[in-house]
């Protein structure tokens, strides 16, 4: 089973994504609520896929920092962004930094699973 790290400051959102993935039965789920936890888990557990929220603090798009740090460690990492940010420039920036996908909130389970299917 592939390890998937879900990174979101919202416990509700982590639970929601976790439930979607658990129904598939193909993933071991890891969770982090912020940048430091995310990087510790990424370094120690080496997840196959990271599902990453951009806005994990009120003042910054901390997810961009996490994405950048992950790509410095492993430029082939599969990072899927989930975010309520709809600005095309932000989406383009995430892809340029190495994200493999960008899913807008509210998350549609079918869309998430379709994106993940590409990396099974």
Language model: regions and residue ranges:
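Short amphipathic alpha-helix used as the core "switch/output" element in two-component signaling
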Residues: 40, 62-75
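C-terminal output helix
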Residues: 89, 107-116
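Alpha4 helix (beta4-alpha4-beta5 surface) of REC/receiver domains from two-component response regulators
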Residues: 61, 86-101
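Two-component/phosphorelay signaling modules centered on CheY-like receiver
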Residues: 11-30
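The short loop immediately C-terminal to the conserved phospho-acceptor aspartate in CheY-like receiver
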Residues: 55-57
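Acidic, metal-coordinating helix/loop segments flanking the phosphotransfer/catalytic sites
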Residues: 31-49
């Amino acid at each position: 089973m592939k390890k998937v790290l879900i990174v979101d400051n919202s416990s509700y959102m982590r639970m929601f994504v976790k439930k979607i993935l658990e129904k598939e039965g193909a993933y071991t789920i890891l969770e982090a609520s912020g940048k430091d936890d995310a990087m510790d888990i990424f370094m120690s557990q080496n997840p196959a896929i990271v599902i990453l929220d951009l806005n994990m603090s009120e003042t910054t798009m901390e997810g961009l920092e996490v994405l950048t740090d992950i790509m410095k460690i492993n430029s082939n990492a599969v990072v899927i962004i989930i975010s309520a940010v709809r600005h095309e420039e932000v989406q383009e920036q995430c892809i340029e930094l190495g994200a493999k996908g960008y899913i807008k909130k509210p998350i549609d389970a079918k869309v998430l699973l379709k994106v993940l299917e590409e990396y099974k």
